Amino acid sequence: PDERLAAAQKENPDTVALITIPGTNIDAPVQQYGDNDYYLRRDEKGTEDYHGCIYADYVCRMDSGVKVSRNLIFYGHTFTDEDYTGGFEDLHNYRVFEFGQENPYIYVSLADEKLTYQIFSVWVCDAKTDTDCIQADPDDAAFQQILDKAVAGCAFDYGVDVTTDDHILTLST
């Protein structure tokens, strides 16, 4: 078990994971609540905060590797006009291909295991209109569509093959 996760869960029982992305400032607890609006404007302790915090989609399952949603979805803010470093600002570094090659992994620590995700796509979409990719447990056909859309929308070829047998992590900002 991850001691940092246990400590964060002691402070706030809504803490379900830790996310770490080497090469970035992203190394933080992940919250989850019964709706996606709760942590939109709250910090990782649950205190009201305009900047919010990193949180998992309320429908995502995060029990263990076998039971984790096939599309684990985390949300975090990006504030480019402020001096704020608590969200997903550094994800924009992945717009540079070399950065993605040098930092290809994202780690998610759960209560009983550490998951490793390899970056296969980085792309920008309109979250209001392009909601297809925000499905935690799509059937195989819908999941294949998500994978196809992610690969087609990416300007780079990371050389990572992803199939419907895999689990993916979607970071939305």
At which residue positions do the language-model features occur?
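Solvent-exposed, non-transmembrane regions of membrane-associated and secreted proteins
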Residues: P1-T173
